[in-house]
Amino acid sequence: MTAKPIIVVAIGGNGICPSAVGAEMSFTAQLIHTKRTLWNLISLLDHYQVVITHGNGPQAGLVYEQMIPRTPFGVVTLVTTSQISSAITRAYEELIIENNLQGLPPLEPVLSWVRVDPHDPGFANPSKPVGQQLSSDQVAELLRYHPEYLFTDYGQGKRRLIASPRPKKVLNIADILEVIEDGKVPVALGGGGIPVFLDNHGRKEIANGILDKDLSSALLAGDLAADDFLILTNEQGVFTGYGTPSMLFHPQIESSQVQRWLSEGEFPPGSMGPKAEAALQFLAANPRGRVIVGHVEEHAEKLLDGSAGTTITAG
């Protein structure tokens, strides 16, 4: 294992491509957006063995609409993982060339398989927002052809909800460890990983759902005995009373407080809820670790020194 401390950096799908209504989704647009995100993370490579994970929410909905009907949604993750990891790798290489950066380790994408329970209640209760934010007219048009679709309010529009079972185990952790041993930066768990069922013979069947990348990343961070777990999102950090006059930002909190707020319904599913659960899961596996939640456009150094974002520790 590497001599450097390990940090798992979970980049939200919006760190690759914005989900705002009407946002451009071309590969070039994603490349530009990704370069901005990675630039804020470059300095981590001086001090950490970095492991990158990423979401696919904005991209997944668009890809699904172009696929054969009744295709398992896990196949969408398989497709988008290739596209997004290519954008991340290309953006990283361009940053190195454009800024004449020397001695940085290469990135290596790792296709990641994650076991889920076929009886998980998440299959019956879709909760994961995917795709871009849609206007009311766009939602109405989709419902004409797909009355079974479910949507949720998100920002200034709506996003579609997809079944999201809980990740149980990262199946190919050895592949990620091999990349680390080779001195490279793994880009793993794209879209939370490809959700699969295992039959009695260990054969994989792709599930009709999408995983939460933060919950999957927490599993990985625990397996790797990571020191820090950085969750990049569209918010400055953790808030209570979100969207109300009593909204309050919390720069430092302990896991017991997160657990209490979570049980009180402070963090809704499909938003901060899974991030809070992921933080608790990682800190249970590594009580000496830290979880940092911060804005995807913030510089990583500020998030790690506590001058920005929210730092969560066990206690």
Task: Please identify what each model-predicted range represents.
Residues 2-315:
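C-terminal catalytic "cap/lid" subdomain
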